[in-house]
Amino acid sequence: MNFSLLFSADVTDRFDRVFWFGDFNFRIQKSRESVDRIMKRHARDQQTIIRELLLHDQLNEVFDRGKIFHGFKENEITFMPTYKFDVNTDVYDSSPKKRVPSWTVK
């Protein structure tokens, strides 16, 4: 065992796998109307919706520019945005705020 790695400040040297958890509060950089159009246009193909929305995901943008999570990669996102639904429904926010569907807790 290489004990110098055990005390390294770089967690990628110290562990085989690292999991980041939390509400990072990154959003999709599109208007609610634009996101709704994308979802309607590709209603029969969720993976196309996901791919198109991820092009505008704030976390992906700063990650791709090398601003955060150096040395890490994110697994492929294969699920629809999880934020924000009306309570006890699968309907995205219909309140006056009309929050943009996003992956705020990936």
Which residue stretches match the model-derived regions?
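Catalytic lobes of large eukaryotic enzymes
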Residues: M1-K106
